[in-house]
């Protein structure tokens, strides 16, 4: 159908070495978002696609990336998929009873510390939803997810529905049996992925 698939090797990942990872964590986390936006703009500039024909996707912490990018540049794409997304950064990182919170201080910072808390608040997807137009968005979550609890993406969608000023689709799909990794059965996993691709392709106008 003429789809080009691109992977963005952005800071915060270790694709280009240890320093590349360090330059996208803690008080440098925003570099991750800047790099992703730069990658998308590069694809358009070099005519691999156009903003109104671009789909973006991120999983877990990558869902945070997509949520932050949508707040910063809602014009960046036609449709976005956030899978089991970590989008309520402040509330999650303030709750030390959650299984990953304390160990994740090394990645994101401790919001109880003033400087780190202010920085994290500046990019937290949930806290920065604006009263503006957003592209079509699909959010997927799982009822038994122990890493990103299902209420987090659910409240994100609820707030987005209340705030956004467009009429583009905003879909929330919860797998009632799965955990953080999604459906585990061979065919169920394929059906889940097919649904997600179908939504993205439909919004790009090449669904059928």
Segments predicted by a language model, with ranges:
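Active-site-proximal cap/loop segments of hydrolase catalytic domains
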Residues: 1, 7-208
